[in-house]
């Protein structure tokens, strides 16, 4: 996306402090521990990814939808809106902002119903419960909570520039790109600028592919390497968690622990 990141609402309003983020989560962390909380967000990032792929959206749109989802819950408890409703709402909004084209509401609902039945039946025993009016109402609430700050800068563009500057081949770009996609399952998109995330993902890819010759190139970068290493640790921790996590066995239990909205008082 063209424009100056440093003058954007992404830079000025949506690079959050880690302590503030943890403080906002305290209510949810009464019901879920930190690992469980992260697993819930990994699951819903996967839901957004599957819905996006079935709608044939570009990865940029899927990534923006995932960032909207994480931004909303950075300021709100999970009990405020059912994540299963917010996920398709974020996709609908991201497709508009990223100028992908209009997704028909009926098609979105149909894809949600199909995905829950075929891809996520291990998590949900009932059908997708929401209709168009729920998603449109949720979209207003989402816009309000994002302060209408809808332009999201992603790490993909700086990653392309870095790989070109490094003079490396497609294999490195392909792996780095996948790691950027994986990074959306962590908090790094809320805490760090996209160019730092791109550098961290590129560094992980170089280690995996044993590109020892790139060490000098990284050393000469004008970047806060401590921040880059924090991002690397967050992504490596994600991979460590993934190794041992049996999602299909655990997710129903985790979803049942999510705090639910209180029903309105009976009149």
UniProtKB/Swiss-Prot annotation:
InterPro entries: Cyclin-like_dom (IPR013763), Cyclin-like_sf (IPR036915), Cyclin/Ssn8 (IPR043198), Cyclin_C_2 (IPR031658), Cyclin_N (IPR006671). This is Cyclin-C. GO terms for cellular component: mediator complex. Component of the Mediator complex, a coactivator involved in regulated gene transcription of nearly all RNA polymerase II-dependent genes. Mediator functions as a bridge to convey information from gene-specific regulatory proteins to the basal RNA polymerase II transcription machinery. Mediator is recruited to promoters by direct interactions with regulatory proteins and serves as a scaffold for the assembly of a functional preinitiation complex with RNA polymerase II and the general transcription factors. SMART domains: CYCLIN. It comes from the Eukaryota. One of its GO terms (biological process) is regulation of transcription by RNA polymerase II. Keywords: Activator, Cyclin, Nucleus, Repressor, Transcription, Transcription regulation.
């Amino acid at each position: 996306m063209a424009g100056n990141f440093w003058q954007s609402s992404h830079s000025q309003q949506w690079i959050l402090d880690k302590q503030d983020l943890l403080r906002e989560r305290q209510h949810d962390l009464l019901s879920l521990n930190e690992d469980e909380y992260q697993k819930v967000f990994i699951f819903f990032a996967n839901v957004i990814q599957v819905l996006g792929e079935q709608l044939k959206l570009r990865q940029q749109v899927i990534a923006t939808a995932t960032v909207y989802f994480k931004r909303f819950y950075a300021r709100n408890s999970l009990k405020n809106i059912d994540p299963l409703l917010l996920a398709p709402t974020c996709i609908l909004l991201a497709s508009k902002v990223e100028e992908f084209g209009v997704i028909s509401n009926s098609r979105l609902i149909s894809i949600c119903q199909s995905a829950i039945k075929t891809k996520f039946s291990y998590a949900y025993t009932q059908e997708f419960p929401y209709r168009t009016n729920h998603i449109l109402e949720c979209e207003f609430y989402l816009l309000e909570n994002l302060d209408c700050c809808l332009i999201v800068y992603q790490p993909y563009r700086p990653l392309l520039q870095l790989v070109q500057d490094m003079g490396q081949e497609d294999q490195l770009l392909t792996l780095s790109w996948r790691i950027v996609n994986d990074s959306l399952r962590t908090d790094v998109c809320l805490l760090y600028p996209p160019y730092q995330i791109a550098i961290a993902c590129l560094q992980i890819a170089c280690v995996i592919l044993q590109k020892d010759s790139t060490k000098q190139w990284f050393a000469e970068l004008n970047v806060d390497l401590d921040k880059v290493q924090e991002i690397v640790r967050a992504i490596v921790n994600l991979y460590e968690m993934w190794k041992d996590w049996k999602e299909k066995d655990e997710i129903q239990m985790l979803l049942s622990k999510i705090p639910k909205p209180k029903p309105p008082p009976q009149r």
